[in-house]
Curated annotation (Swiss-Prot):
Name of the gene: ctl1
GO terms of biological process kind: macroautophagy; protein transport; transmembrane transport
Sugar-modified residues: N40, N101, N457, N558
Superkingdom to which the source organism belongs: Eukaryota
Signal peptide residue numbers: none
Native species: Schizosaccharomyces pombe (strain 972 / ATCC 24843) (Fission yeast)
InterPro entries: Choline_transptr-like
Locations listed in the record: Endoplasmic reticulum membrane; Preautophagosomal structure membrane
Protein name: Choline transporter-like protein ctl1
Amino acid sequence: MFSDYASRFLAQSRFSSVDQRNFKYPTSRSNLQSVSIDRNSSIDSHETDLSAGSSSLHGLNSLIDSGSIHWQLREQEQSNSHISRNENELFSKENSIYNGNFSENLGVQPNPQTISHESVNEEYTELPYDAHLPSEQKVPDRKWGLTFGFLTLALFTYSFLMVWRTNPNIPPATSPYAAIQKAFPLFHKDAIICMMLSVIWLFCLVAIPRFLYFLLASVPLTMFAFAVYLLKASRIHLETSIQPKLMLLTGIILLVAPILLSYYVWRRRIHFETSFNIIRLACRVIADIPQITLIFISFLFSFYVLIFIWVRLFARLFLRGSTLVGSVWVLPRSSWVLASFYSLHFLWLCTFFHALQCAIISSIVSQWFFYRDTKSSATKTNLVSHFFYHVVSNQYGLCAFSSFLVVITKVPLHFLPTWLRHVSRIVYYMFSKTSASYVTSPLTLAYASIYSVPYMNASKALYQIEQLNRVGLRRRSYYFSKYTLLAARSLLAIGVGVTSWNYSIHENGVFYGYIVGLLGGFLAWLIIGAIEGGLSMIVDALLICSIIDISSCQGDPNGSHCFEAWQLFESNGY
């Protein structure tokens, strides 16, 4: 009995001494120093009481049998834990006062009205709300959602008026309208094939662990095969057509791309295992919540319907105000200007649907990440339907604003020279005080949808996070996993575009076959994006939830809600 007491007392004394040695008190903080003095005095008083109790009894055996030792140890442990909690609270409040960020109203979610550039870090460490608990319904960026709705309604109204006023039987077979109309059966076949391949691809990722290695190895080989195919097809002799030259140029690009891709993969071969494990963790989320596949399939069919409605309306533009000169169909400049506006709005519309999908998936992943072990009577189907309704009804403005910023910021930067990109980023930073890379990042939309805050506030929050250093992040496993998923999407889009282009040349005319190829590739890009993009959205949401979790548990893996995510993102430096 005495040995048990002695070992327990020595262990507790050693733990207390180690804790006191490791705890560093700030020299300029009087509150914490007073707490330290009170703690030492309370420990001394407990030791005095223990020695007094020992001397007052008649023997060691009676002291041990009385049970006072156990009572005193429990009292000391409770008092020490209470003092530790007070110290932590005082330390956090004093830090907030010292930094000028202290606020009396501490909520679970960031306040979209009071969030500022200086206080985003403290609000970022708070966990998102539980979907099973009642919460305040907020509609961030509502005016942008209404603006997007009015513009879409106006554009479709004009399109239906144009359909009513134009005659599809006038143009000859060499017009763009005739080429697009003849390619519609091919588009339907390509869309069905893309949907089947995307579903099979997702099933293989979830069911076959080593499928990613096969996918990464097949990308350069398939691109090389497409390059040889285009170089061979460019030998056809077509007068008054630039398509052989375009085929030759595209074939050369596809011939050089596998070499650059192989070099990039070889230099980052050390990130193979970590990046593949990140994708496997995303597949685990799908396996735990299989209802996410219903979100994927619903957006898959939404893109399918949207594309074919828009393509038919877009083809009607080439009937507007046209005149026939000989056998050539001449288009006025206004038709090309309207076609440009149609293309930009369609790009905004597709990005809006993509943002809706990202917001829904990010909310579901955050619920799985933080509350998957919480007992609740709600089923997973109810959870998915709740977030679907919440995003569609309350976050449509957020999705509209984020998609608008992506279209006007990210798309032009891809076509500008390098020096103009730097100049545009500087000008953008002068007006928004935030880097353009954070404004167009999918991580910003994931954070904004999880906390239901305005989009610009979310970009400011991410701008303050040290873990998201954009310079170092591009060299890490997170981006390699994203590029692996993007490679599969690009491969299918290139394949569909090349086959549509070649089919249009040999079967339906030669003058505007490249338009058919571009539409076919864009069709495949959007359809496979509903699956591949959804998996990439899960990876983004896991990264955001991991950063929130790491900030809330102060980097301690024992306090993490998902140890696998902490091991993949924090221990490997993302």
